[in-house]
Amino acid sequence: MSNQNIRIKLKAFDHRLIDKSAVEIVETAKRTGASVRGPIPLPTKKERFTVLTSPHVNKKARDQYELRTYVRLMDVISPTDKTVDALMKLDLAAGVDVAIKLN
């Protein structure tokens, strides 16, 4: 696995959770002898929703909601077998979505 790279993409709605998970991944990879690029913060996706508060009339009464999706990207360069095993056993927070690709 010395000539391959691992690309890890983290997605979450809470920036504190995603930053803690990114730190855990970086520490685990460095402890097993691999080098890491990142975490690189990608642009935050903001979805805005406007909802009428009144069920019948009063068009002027509205509530606005926003859903932010935070994304971090990391590259693990020249991972060893120990690195892959440690990353597979790593237990991250429940609100973080992890996507792993081998290059």
Swiss-Prot record:
Disulfide bonds: none
Matching InterPro entries: Ribosomal_uS10, Ribosomal_uS10_CS, Ribosomal_uS10_dom, Ribosomal_uS10_dom_sf
Pfam families tied to this protein: Ribosomal_S10
Keyword Iron-sulfur attributed: no
Gene Ontology, cellular component aspect: ribonucleoprotein complex; ribosome
Gene3D superfamilies, per database record: Ribosomal protein S10 domain (3.30.70.600)
Signal peptide residues on this chain, from the entry's feature table: none
Gene Ontology process terms (BP): translation
Keywords: Ribonucleoprotein, Ribosomal protein
SUPFAM superfamilies hit by this protein: Ribosomal protein S10
Record GO terms (molecular function): structural constituent of ribosome; tRNA binding
PROSITE patterns, A to Z: RIBOSOMAL_S10 (PS00361)
Function: Involved in the binding of tRNA to the ribosomes.
Subunit and partners: Part of the 30S ribosomal subunit.
Entry similarity comment: Belongs to the universal ribosomal protein uS10 family.
Entry protein name: Small ribosomal subunit protein uS10
Organism: Vesicomyosocius okutanii subsp. Calyptogena okutanii (strain HA)
Source species taxonomy: Bacteria, Pseudomonadati, Pseudomonadota, Gammaproteobacteria, Candidatus Pseudothioglobaceae
Gene for this chain: rpsJ
